[in-house]
Design a protein with these regions (language model features):
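Short catalytic/ligand-binding loop motif for oxyanion handling, primarily in non-cytosolic enzymes
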Residues: 45-49, 178-181, 211, 241-243
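Residue-level marker for buried hydrophobic side chains located in beta-strands
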Residues: 202-203
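Conserved core of the PLP fold type I
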Residues: 67-195, 209-228, 232
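Glycine-rich "substrate-gating" loop/helix at the edge of Rossmann-like oxidoreductase active sites
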Residues: 8-12, 179, 237-239
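N-terminal small-domain helix-loop-helix segment of the aminotransferase-like
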Residues: 3-6, 10-106, 114
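Walker B catalytic acidic pair
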Residues: 206
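Active-site PLP attachment segment
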Residues: 223-251
């Protein structure tokens, strides 16, 4: 008789954003005229940018012509023309990437959860708290021990490593979801040194790097020496295309 994975019983009853949606709906039912800034799930706020629409149309047209049609690519890691474009994007930050160091997958969220499948279930996982739910849930489902580094006002919402605490896998998100804090170059140097001392791997979620404006805040952990030896970076190139409008951002800043 099949048995269940009892680790799933360690998860919350509902996905975090389902609970947030229920609370929002209840609040709006009681306060229909109240202004509300939604800070739950990251839904789009504007129509897709015209340049993206035209690019997708062009791509669809190419698939209808024998000379430009593309099927599966051979490597399983993404078309070379796309990986070259990604490498060019990283060059803006002074980061040099070989094509075999780049993998195109179905999204940063999926990768942050699925990447741990290649690691043993006995690894200790360090996650900054608060954190994006997928970091915690994906590891709890596999029965791993999850420990936390608190991000709060006392440290500027930028949790730093405790040399007395051991971890095998480390999740960092910069700029952070949900706090918005971002690690400086010196802070990332400290995390890299900690990872090397523990022979640990950093899983670095850089999905929101496009919103960084401070020159002292790296867009990629690979801007910091030694990162390639201990870090796997997940990035997204979709966050600026209608995901956050200037009007929306200014409203948040005013609060």
């Amino acid at each position: 008789m099949p048995t269940i994975n009892e680790n799933f019983l360690k998860l919350e009853k509902n996905y975090l954003f389902i609970n947030i949606a229920k609370k929002v709906n209840a609040f709006m039912a009681e306060n229909p005229d109240a202004p509300l800034i939604r800070m739950g799930i990251g839904d789009v706020t504007l129509p897709i940018a015209p340049v993206c629409v035209e690019a997708m149309k062009k791509g669809a047209d190419e698939m209808g012509v024998k000379e430009t049609f593309r099927g599966y690519e051979d490597s399983g890691s993404g078309y070379d023309f796309l990986k070259k474009a990604i490498a060019g994007y990283y060059e803006k930050f002074g980061v040099s990437l070989e094509l075999d160091e780049i993998r195109v997958n179905d999204g940063a969220k999926s990768d942050c959860g699925n990447i741990v499948d290649i690691f043993g279930d006995d690894n200790i996982v360090l996650i900054t708290d608060p954190a994006y739910p997928v970091y915690v849930d994906s590891n709890k489902m596999n029965g791993r021990t999850v420990i936390y580094a608190d991000s709060d006002e006392s440290n500027g919402f930028a949790a730093m490593p405790n040399p007395e605490v051991h971890a095998d896998l480390i999740y960092l998100c910069s700029p952070n979801n949900p706090t918005g804090s971002a690690y400086t170059r010196d802070q990332l140097k400290e995390w890299i040194a900690y990872a090397k001392a523990n022979k640990a791997i950093i899983i670095f979620d850089a999905a929101y790097e496009a919103f960084i404006t401070d020159p002292d805040v790296p867009h990629s952990i690979y801007e910091v020496e030694g990162a390639k030896e201990c870090a796997i970076e997940m990035c997204s190139l979709s966050k600026t295309a209608g995901f956050r409008s200037e009007e929306h951002t200014s409203k948040l800043q005013s609060h």
